[in-house]
Amino acid sequence: MAGVAVAVATTTPPDATATLQAMQSCRRESAALERLDCYDHLLAPLSPSGFDGALVKAGFVGEAWTRATEQEKRREGNTTELLVTQVPGERPTVVITTPAIGHVPPRPVLMFSCVDNITRMQVALMHPLDVHDIAVTLNADSRALRSHWFVRENGTLLESSRGLSGIDEIKQLFGAKTLTVDTGADNAAGKLTFNIDGLARAIAPLRDACHWAGE
C-alpha cells in the first residue's frame, strides 16, 4: 500500500495526513472484504456530477443499517425492550434490536446480530458521522468501558470489533439495565442511550447461532 499512499499524498497534499490516517484505519480491518470496501470508499474519485453525486452518496443505505431499521418497524408501540428475531438454517441468523431512549422516530438503533456466523454489535445512526473510526465510551449503568469502533456504511453505522474481542465487549454489558454509547461527537449521535435490560438472557439464541466458545 505504500505506492498508493504516495499517490494520494502527491495528488491531494492538503489532505495527505488525514488520508494516510484513514488508510491506517482500513489496515486494521480483519476481514478482507471489509478492508477492501474501506479502501474503495476512501480512494474512490469524486463524482463529476457534483451536488447530484453528493446526493447519491448521502442516500446510500447499507445492509446492516437496513436490517436494524426494518426490524424496528415491527415494534409495537413506543417500547424499548430488546426485540429478537431468528431465521433457522445451516447458518442461522439472529438479530436483536432496541431503539435509542429519548429520541423521536426515526430513532437510532442498537443491534446485536449473528449473520454468516459472525457476531456484531452495531448502532444504526440517523445522522451520519464523517469519520472512518472513532473512540467511544460505553457506559453500562455505573461501569465505563473505553473502546474503539469503526464507522461504516457511509457514516450511518457504528460497529464494534468482531471476533473474540467483540464478544468480550458484549459480555461486559451483561447485568446492566442501560447502555450509553458516547462518541464525543457534537451532534445527535454524540450520546445514545439504550435499554439493554435482560441482554444476557435475550442473547442466548445468538450465542448458540454464532457458536460462542464455551457455550
Segments predicted by a language model, with ranges:
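Gram-negative bacterial Sec-dependent N-terminal signal peptides
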Residues: 1-11
